[in-house]
Amino acid sequence: MSVRRAIVAALLLILPAAAQGGFLAIEEGARATGMGGAFTAVADDATAVFWNPAGLAFMDGFKLTGMGTRLFSVDDLSENVVSLTYSGWEKTGIGAGWARTGVDEVYDENTFVLSAGREVFRDGLSVGGTFRIYRLAAPGYEYYNDPNFNDGAQDYAFDLGFLYRARTWSAALAVRNLGQPEMSLISTTEDGDPVSSEVRVGGAYVFREVMLISGELRIPKEVPGYYTRSVRYALGTEIWFVGAFALRAGINDGKATAGLGLRISWLTVDASLLSVRRPGTKYRLSLSLDF
C-alpha cells in the first residue's frame, strides 16, 4: 500500500476525530503559536481574523501574513495559512483569511473567514465578528469506490469578539463557532461530526514596551459523545530586543512552545515549534508584511 493510501486509511479510521478536532487544532501564525497560543487578548497582527476580530479596530494600513507548517516530520502532511487585513478608516478594520490542513489529493480541511472590527462606546473598547466557512474533503477515498461517500462537506459558523486595550494591558472575550457546524463525508451518517463552540477569556500585559505576557482560558461547549466541558489554558511571553529580534515561549494546555522573530522595516519573519512527545514536533514559519 502506498504512503498516501495508508494515510487515507488512517484518516478514515479516525474521521470523526479528524472532523471535530482538526478545525480546532490548527492555530494560525508562528508568532501566536510561539507564545503558546495565548493570543486572544493580543490580536494585533493579520491573524486577528482567526483569533479575535475585535483587534482589527486598533490596526493601521494593510497587514499580510502567510504561514507554512511541517507537521510531526511527515512530508505529505501540512498546514497553510494566509490572512490579510486593512484598517484605513477611523476605529474600523476588516480582514479575510484562509487556513488549510491536509495531504495533497488525499484529505483537506479548509477554513475561509471574513472579519470586521470596530471601536465602540469608549476609547479602547472594540467589538468584532468573523464569518467562517468550513469545507471538508477526502478525494483520496475515491479509490475505495464507496457508494456512501460524499465528495465533500460544508458548513458555517460565526465568531464574536470583544477587546479592551489600555496603555499597558488588555482584556478580551471571544466566542468561537457560534452555530456549531456539523459535517460528515459518509451519506449514511444521520448526524454530522460537530466543530465545538468555545469561549475564550484572556488578558495581556506589556512591561516597559519590550516584554509582553499573555494568558487565556478556553471553555468548549459540552457535546455528549464528542466534547467534555474541560477548561484548557494557554500562557505565553514575548521579549523584543532593540525592536528587531524577539524571543517567545509558552505553554499550551501543558505542551511547551517556543519561537523567535526577526523584524526588518516592513518585513517580519517568525518561527515557532510545539513539542509533543507523541506524535512529534510541529514547526511553523510565518512571513508578515506591514504596509
Explain the meaning of each model-derived region.
Residues 1-29:
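Cleavable N-terminal export/targeting peptides
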Residues 20-291:
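Subset of outer-membrane beta-barrel
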